[in-house]
């Protein structure tokens, strides 16, 4: 008899294909509960957690998250994600994504070009892109170096101060173009607004405060995931 082996997780792109609920969180340095929070979020049905500490309470209290500390936080997230089959995303930094062994690198419009980021992280890391208008979404939908894109902000949000909300029209136009790769709506999304978003054609979402500020993050994630799955 051959010894049994633990089931290997699916490659990141295969898990991306079924992902519906994407969470951005800061490192929660002022609370010191990142691993516990991530455990609750993944248990509630979050598929992807991105670490994004810009503008966070921890940054205000302790200063910018340095590379060593970011790698430590990502290691915490990866340990939890591994238990749940979830994905861990790095924001902006291709070098950090490579060093951390992250599943996903997410790039903004002002970050490294996707083709150059791909040279750094290699062929297996999922690369995502933020888009804020129809033209950017259209380009992201056909860029061979991008695996998914986010479009928004649908509604104004304090996590992106100064960025004008794109509204549901951007969601509708993106849905109507029938992209062949996964795309997520982002910006000001919560359980109350989710029906409008689903009606506009989105079936994948990125949230922040809807889970990070919830009294019960696991329950908040479960409610969002249930609504997404019920509509699919």
From Swiss-Prot:
Residues where 2-[(2R,5Z)-2-carboxy-4-methylthiazol-5(2H)-ylidene]ethyl phosphate binds: 157-159, 188
EC code: 2.5.1.3
Cofactor comment text: Binds 1 Mg(2+) ion per subunit.
Keywords (A to Z) from UniProt: Magnesium, Metal-binding, Thiamine biosynthesis, Transferase
Entry superkingdom: Bacteria
UniProt cofactor(s): Mg(2+)
HAMAP family named among the record's database cross-references: TMP_synthase (MF_00097)
Identification of the protein by name: Thiamine-phosphate synthase
Species in which this protein is naturally found: Nocardia farcinica (strain IFM 10152)
């Amino acid at each position: 008899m051959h010894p049994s082996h633990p089931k290997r997780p699916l490659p990141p792109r295969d898990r991306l294909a079924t992902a519906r609920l994407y969470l951005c969180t800061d490192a929660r340095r002022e609370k010191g509960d990142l691993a516990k929070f991530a455990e609750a979020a993944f248990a509630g049905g979050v598929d992807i957690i991105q670490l994004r500490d810009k503008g966070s309470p921890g940054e205000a209290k302790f200063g910018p998250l340095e590379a060593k500390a970011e790698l430590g936080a990502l290691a915490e997230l990866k340990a939890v994600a591994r238990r749940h089959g979830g994905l861990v995303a790095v924001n902006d930094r291709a070098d950090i994504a490579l060093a951390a062994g992250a599943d996903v690198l997410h790039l903004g419009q002002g970050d490294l070009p996707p083709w150059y980021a791909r040279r750094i992280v290699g062929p297996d890391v999922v690369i995502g892109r933020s888009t804020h208008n129809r033209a950017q979404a259209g380009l992201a939908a056909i860029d061979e170096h991008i695996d998914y894109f986010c479009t928004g902000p649908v509604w104004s949000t304090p996590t992106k101060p100064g960025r004008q909300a794109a509204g549901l029209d951007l969601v509708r136009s993106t849905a109507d173009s029938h992209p062949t790769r996964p795309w997520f709506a982002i910006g000001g999304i919560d359980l109350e607004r989710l029906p409008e978003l689903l009606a506009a054609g989105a079936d994948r979402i990125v949230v922040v405060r809807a889970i990070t500020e919830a009294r019960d993050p696991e329950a908040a994630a479960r409610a969002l995931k249930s609504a997404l799955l019920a509509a699919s």
